[in-house]
Amino acid sequence: MGARRLRVRSQRSRDSSVPTQCNQTECFDPLVRNCVSCELFHTPDTGHTSSLEPGTALQPQEGSALRPDVALLVGAPALLGLILALTLVGLVSLVSWRWRQQLRTASPDTSEGVQQESLENVFVPSSETPHASAPTWPPLKEDADSALPRHSVPVPATELGSTELVTTKTAGPEQ
């Protein structure tokens, strides 16, 4: 019965948020929910990290210049943006340089050939040809008034005296 009482007590102390009472040399650790040596909570005052025992964790110092996670969050995108910008500037300058080189090499040789070619393919419109900016309309038919309109929008049949709206899904009273 004593073992049961201890088991119930230990489960109760794990589930409760109230820390268990510990000795003066021990401190309550909420992670393991048990009393541990208080020396594990404090880092030694010495500046040498090599003298620490393996398995002890260092707490981050408040006097550190720049935390590595902040440097990664800001530095990595900034470096990536700089690399992309330099690549874009390099590509634009390379394309413009190639374009200038092609213009420089092509201009002395083809200046006369371009003029000859452009004069040979000139189209001179006659006086009967309408102006290029004038719209061209199809000729009107003689029987435009008698032809039925070619629209697909359903219209109400008011000319027959009916007041209901004619749609594609409704059937009129004629049917």
Swiss-Prot record:
Glycosylation sites: N23
Primary site of residence: membrane
GO molecular function: signaling receptor activity
Cytoplasmic side: 93-175
Keywords on record: Adaptive immunity, Disulfide bond, Glycoprotein, Immunity, Membrane, Receptor, Signal-anchor, Transmembrane, Transmembrane helix
Segments of skewed composition (Polar residues): 160-175
Membrane topology per record: Single-pass type III membrane protein
Residues in compartment: Extracellular: 1-71
Disease / disorder: Defects in Tnfrsf13c are a cause of severe B-cell deficiency. B-cell deficient strain A/WySnJ has a 4.7 kb insertion in the BAFFR gene leading to an altered C-terminus. The mutant RNA is not detectable. B-cell lymphopoiesis is normal, but the life span of peripheral B-cells is much reduced.
Protein name: Tumor necrosis factor receptor superfamily member 13C
Natural source organism: Mus musculus
Origin organism lineage: Eukaryota, Metazoa, Chordata, Craniata, Vertebrata
